[in-house]
Amino acid sequence: MAVAAVSAQTPAEHWAKALADFDAADRAVPPPPGNVLFIGSSTIVNWDLAKAFPAVRTVNRGVWSSSLYDAVQRIDRLVLPYAPRLIVLYAGDNDINSGATSEQVAVEFERFAFNVWAKLPQTRMVFIGLKPSPQRWAQVHRMRATNALIRQFCEHDDRLAFLDVDGVMLGWDEKPRRDLYVEDGLHLSSQGYQLWSTLLSPFLQ
């Protein structure tokens, strides 16, 4: 879905269409349980999972412009039907951009994990740390504070893992590498996805 189309919809309309599209895809090709489920914002939507991880059964249920709060509110539609063995989550970037505090985002991830485990106690999760993007560089300190809190939470449960992408996405000047982003300075380029795929691969076993 194009960004322009998303912005023309209300949040309720946007989510209704996204969930209807997922339902249609599931009816056409029902995904078996035990897959690796990717959820989150446009960073997940744009990831070519079949190309990046050809040997792994993946399901992409990313939604444009979505937040971590959105994921928590829709676990029954985004997660539970798929009974995944592993969830890969990238979300929270948009929450921070909308004014949420680091503490609020970290609490949302804790809620997400506990709500999933209430129904799927064996499911593991990988939280991809919030990325340092050129467009949102002014928010990097809040992003890093969020990452620190979520990393700390992940260290207390073997079902959780935190994938830190911050340092490897910076150049010699300690600023985000432009080659890892498309022109908008927010979304990942093919080089960015290649880097992330390499970093994530060991977690998918």
Give, region by region, the residue ranges found by the protein language model.
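Serine-esterase "nucleophile elbow" of acetyl-processing enzymes
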Residues: 4-85
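Alpha-helical cap/lid subdomain in secreted, periplasmic
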Residues: 51-53, 73-205
